[in-house]
Structure formats: structure tokens, C-alpha cells
């Protein structure tokens, strides 16, 4: 996991959110790039000679029989793409609501057309219907998340086998539009998308981001904001670290003391907080609408002081420890031989599993210093059985790889571990190497937020590695995906989190999505430079990493995305 061994023993003073620092240009000259899409598509050909122009006549259309999920994506596209307005100071209105085509009709000119399609034919999702052939300029790649984006001067077509692919194709279209669409400023000119084709699908199924809301609490609205930013970069797993020594952050109805006591504070002694089950369910729904699966983590048997202070019977001596507001680790553990411990674990897994439609439950399992190895192995294997009883697949940090895991369980590696043994038994691995993707590490020695026990992690360090060759004995077939955690020892406000998360999360998103052959540091840094204005338009408090040529990158070779009237 995070934090641990090399961090100081006392809680740090709360650091005010840093103001965005002045852009610092890298020494390298500007690099011309054909597009600024992140993650890099599997294949993209964009022409400089022509473009599709969005204006007041543009409409979003879907097939007559398109399911509700497709209509939802179409509504998101219509809401995102503004109609140009010539009225200074007024926000640009969205496109009209999408409309359904009549059966058998072709999409009209001047339209953005979303269609479920396989092998060049539109897919009728009704069980009693046969596929309706519609001429297609491109077929989407296979897989639920693949898509094809085809732009002509007359039409934009996004085709995909499943609604998730349409959603990701819409994010690519979004990034081909100018950053001004993000804040809906007055656009007294027409918007243009370069003509060309994109065929794209993810390399890995799991492209994750972890928020530690236990050490410092984040309000539901702040979590939703991170979900929105994840969607922009095609990330699809939100791992919520919901319990630790410093706080318990989700209501458990059978154990109300967990939030009444354990949710009452955080690092530094602040007021803490927690999510009601209704708020958590709302977060899950909000994320699902953006094709993000929520993965809950309740750390056990260590990192449990908030639970031990709430329910003394979970301690082997039955005593109540004080609430903890520092950042040390390893001093707490559930009593592994207590029947009360296992009633508690069952209650938590049962209630949270019922609230979480995704297939995973994360038990933590890291940094256990108070149990013998035999006790630890017994705990993990028994917890695994409870997780399976409630229909979920167990995930645990690196340390669980030393136990007899079921092949359906997943190891999330953060340090060198025994994952190769789990892979040899048919198990899968999530790669979260601390020295590469722990976003709570400082960028450099001058960074005011974050820690450095795993080293300094600049943007290139987060980007420049290949998951398939990273861990001996763990090949690409055994890798479920990659995930970037941000631990919150030094983070108090949403702006603090954003400062350490961006732009490194965009780098990790490309590691997880793009084929290795489509990746390269020089091209990435050039594309990332063009995301500065987009992140600014979204109000993100991102770090102006000096290795990125913010403001220097040459304009795309494709036509300028904003075309005067």
C-alpha cells in the first residue's frame, strides 16, 4: 500500500492548496503533433485539408432501436458540444437534444451519428430483431470498449460494439474540439473537427485511480469531480480507500458506531466525515453512468485503528484505543481468533457488497506487523471465503500474494512481491508500483505537497514504463491492468489532491489504454502540453511540470480546431 515505513511519525501540518505555478518551458523545441488525444489511440489518421464544422444546424442522431445507454451517451455529446454564438459574454448553448432516426433511415448531413455496430453493420439490440444494415465507413475494433470515429466534412460517426465504446469515442471527439468547450465560454465562431479516422480499443481492461478518503475525507461532490476527469482520460475503475487507522468513511447500518466514532476525525484532528449508504449508492450510480466501476476497499487486518476505537471487542484485550490522527502505520490489527472479528468482517462485506454492483471487494491486507505470518495467512484466506460468499472477487495488496489465493482473486502489487506465483496459478495482477504511479509522491524536491519514501516521481517516471515487462514472471496475459493511487497524508482540500494527481494521472491513463507501439515520451509530452488549456478550462489545479513544454508545443498538423465565421 502506501505511506509506511519511511514517513515521519508525526502528522504533518496542513498545507494550503498551492496556487498554479508559472509555466516553466522545457528546453526542447516545439514538437508538431497530428492530434492531442490522450490516451493515444491505437490508430489515428487525421487530415489537414478539411474539417467537419459544428454549427446551429448540427444535430446528434442515434438509431431507431438504440437502447437507453446509447441515448444517454448521445445526450452527453449534445450537452458537451456547444453551438457557436455571436453574443459576447454569453455562454454557448448546447446542441439540441439527440433524435432517433426512423427505421432504415440513413443519418442526415451535418450530424453526429452514434451507432452500435459490428463488422460494418448496425446492431439491433432487440432480441427479436435481425441486424439492420447501414453503410459504415469503418468498423469498430472488437471488445466492449473499442470504437471507431470517422469524420468527414459532412458527418461525424462514432461506431462501437457496446455503449461503453461509444462513450470513449465521444471522449476522443471531445478532445478534438478546442478547450473552450469545457467552460462553455462564448464562441463567436464555428467549431471544427479534423477529417479522418480513429480506430481504438484499450490495451488493459483495468485502468484505475485510487482515492484515499480515509486519512482526509473528500465530500461526494469532490469525488464526482474526479470521476468526471477520469472519464475524460478513459479510466474505468475508481478504487475508494474507505477505512484506515485515521477514519471509517462509509455507513454500516449494523455497526453505526463505526461512523459515529471512527468517522469523527482525520489526520491533524479535523472533523473527518463519512458517506451515508444513500450517498455511496449515488456515487456508484454517477460513476456507472460514466463507465467507471467503483471498487470499495476496507483495509484489514491492519490499518484498522478507526474500527478498533469504535468497537473495542475487535481488540484482543477488549480495550478501547484512542482515535488516531497521525500517519504511522503497522500498529493496529483486528484480533484474528475472535468470533466478534469475523461477525464484523461478515457485516461489512455483506452490506457493502449489496450496495456495490461491481464484481470486486478490496480487503487491503498490507503492512500487517502485529500478527504472525501464520495468523496473517489464515486471516486472508478466511476473508477471501467471506468475499466469495457475497458474490465478489477479492483484491488485496502485494502482501496477500504470500497466501493460498483462489485464481479468481487479484493481487494489486505496490512493492516487489510474490505475484509471479499467483500468476502461475492463473491469477491476475493489477500493477501499482509505488516508484512509478503513487501520485502522493513529490514531483521533485521542491514540491510542497506529498511524501518521498518511494522516491521522487515526475511525469516521465509515471509514463515511461511497460507493464508487460515490469515484473519478472508476470506477462501481459496475467495483467488485469494498472492503477494510480493517491494517498492523502498531506492532502486536505480537493485542490491539494488535484495538484498531485494532474498531470501524472493522464500519463498513467495512457500506460493503461494505449498499445506500447503507439506510445513514446516525446509525443506524449507534446500532446500533454496541449491539455494545459483544457485542464485550466476545467478549473483543475494541476502542476505545471517543467518537463512539459506548456505553451510551446506547435499547433496540430490538422486544421485549427476553431474556424472563424
Regions inferred by a protein language model and the residue ranges of each:
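Contiguous, structured surface segment used for ligand recognition
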Residues: 14, 18-204, 485, 496, ...
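Conserved, mostly hydrophobic/aromatic
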Residues: 60, 162, 209, 230, ...
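Flexible loop/turn segments at secondary-structure boundaries
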Residues: 68-69, 217-219, 245-251, 301-307, ...
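Feature activates predominantly on carbohydrate-active enzymes
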Residues: 136-332, 338-342, 347-360, 382, ...
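Structural recognition of the beta-strand scaffold that forms the well-ordered cores
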Residues: 207-210, 239-241, 296, 360-362, ...
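Gly/Pro-rich turn-and-neighbor structural signature
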Residues: 340-423
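Flexible, acidic glycine-rich loops studded with aromatic residues
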Residues: 404-407, 415-565
Amino acid at each position: 500500500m502506501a505511506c509506511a515505513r519511511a514517513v515521519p511519525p508525526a502528522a504533518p501540518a496542513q498545507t494550503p492548496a498551492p496556487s498554479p505555478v508559472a509555466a516553466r518551458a522545457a528546453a526542447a523545441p516545439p514538437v508538431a503533433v497530428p492530434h492531442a488525444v490522450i490516451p493515444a489511440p491505437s490508430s489515428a489518421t487525421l487530415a489537414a485539408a478539411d474539417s467537419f464544422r459544428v454549427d446551429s444546424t448540427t444535430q446528434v442522431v442515434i438509431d431507431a432501436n438504440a437502447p437507453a445507454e446509447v441515448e444517454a451517451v448521445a445526450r452527453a455529446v449534445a450537452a458537451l458540444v456547444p453551438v457557436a454564438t455571436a453574443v459576447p459574454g454569453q455562454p454557448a448553448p448546447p446542441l439540441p437534444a439527440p433524435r432517433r432516426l426512423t427505421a432504415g433511415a440513413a443519418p442526415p448531413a451535418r450530424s453526429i451519428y452514434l451507432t452500435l455496430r459490428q463488422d460494418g453493420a448496425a446492431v439491433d439490440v432487440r432480441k427479436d430483431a435481425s441486424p439492420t444494415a447501414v453503410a459504415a465507413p469503418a468498423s469498430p475494433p472488437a471488445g466492449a470498449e473499442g470504437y471507431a470515429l470517422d469524420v468527414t466534412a459532412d458527418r461525424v460517426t462514432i461506431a462501437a460494439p457496446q455503449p461503453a465504446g461509444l462513450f470513449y469515442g465521444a471522449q476522443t471527439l471531445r478532445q478534438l474540439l478546442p478547450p473552450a468547450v469545457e467552460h462553455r465560454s462564448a464562441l463567436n465562431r464555428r467549431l471544427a473537427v479534423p477529417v479522418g479516422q480513429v480506430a481504438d480499443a484499450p490495451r488493459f481492461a483495468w485502468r484505475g485511480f485510487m482515492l484515499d478518503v480515509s486519512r482526509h475525507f473528500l465530500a461526494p461532490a469532490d469525488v464526482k469531480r474526479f470521476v468526471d476527469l477520469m472519464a475524460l482520460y478513459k479510466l474505468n475503475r475508481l478504487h475508494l480507500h474507505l477505512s484506515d487507522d485515521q477514519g471509517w468513511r462509509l455507513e454500516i447500518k449494523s455497526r453505526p458506531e463505526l461512523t459515529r466514532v471512527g468517522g469523527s476525525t482525520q489526520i491533524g484532528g479535523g472533523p473527518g466525515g463519512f458517506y451515508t449508504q444513500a450517498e455511496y449508492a449515488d456515487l456508484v450510480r454517477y460513476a456507472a453512468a460514466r463507465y467507471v466501476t467503483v471498487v470499495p476497499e476496507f483495509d484489514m487486518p491492519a490499518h484498522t485503528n478507526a474500527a478498533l476505537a469504535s468497537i473495542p471487542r475487535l481488540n484482543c484485550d477488549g480495550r478501547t484505543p484512542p482515535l488516531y490522527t497521525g500517519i504511522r502505520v503497522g500498529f493496529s490489527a483486528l484480533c484474528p481468533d475472535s468470533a466478534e472479528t469475523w461477525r464484523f468482517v461478515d457485516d461489512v462485506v455483506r452490506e457493502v457488497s449489496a450496495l456495490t454492483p461491481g464484481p470486486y471487494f478490496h480487503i487491503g491486507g498490507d503492512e500487517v506487523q502485529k500478527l504472525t505470518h501464520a495468523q496473517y495467512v489464515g486471516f486472508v484466506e478466511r476473508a477471501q471465503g467471506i468475499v466469495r460468499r457475497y458474490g465478489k472477487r477479492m483484491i488485496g495488496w502485494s502482501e496477500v500474494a504470500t497466501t493460498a489465493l483462489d485464481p479468481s482473486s487479484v493481487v494489486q502489487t505496490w512493492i516487489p512481491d510474490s505475484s509471479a506465483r499467483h500468476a502461475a496459478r492463473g491469477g491476475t495482477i493489477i500493477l501499482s508500483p509505488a516508484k512509478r504511479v503513487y501520485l502522493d509522491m513529490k514531483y521533485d524536491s521542491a514540491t510542497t505537497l506529498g511524501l518521498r519514501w518511494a522516491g521522487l516521481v515526475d511525469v516521465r517516471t509515471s509514463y515511461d514504463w511497460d507493464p508487460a515487462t515490469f515484473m519478472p514472471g508476470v506477462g501481459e496475459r496475467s495483467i488485469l491492468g494498472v492503477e494510480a493511487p493517491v494517498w492523502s497524508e498531506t492532502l486536505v482540500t480537493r485542490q491539494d489532491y488535484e495538484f498531485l494527481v494532474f498531470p501524472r494521472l493522464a500519463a498513467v491513463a495512457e500506460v493503461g489504454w494505449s498499445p506500447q507501439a503507439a506510445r513514446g515520451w516525446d509525443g506524449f509530452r507534446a500532446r500533454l502540453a496541449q491539455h494545459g488549456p483544457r485542464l485550466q478550462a476545467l478549473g483543475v489545479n494541476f502542476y505545471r511540470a517543467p518537463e512539459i513544454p506548456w505553451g510551446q508545443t506547435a499547433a496540430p498538423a490538422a486544421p485549427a480546431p476553431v474556424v472563424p465565421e
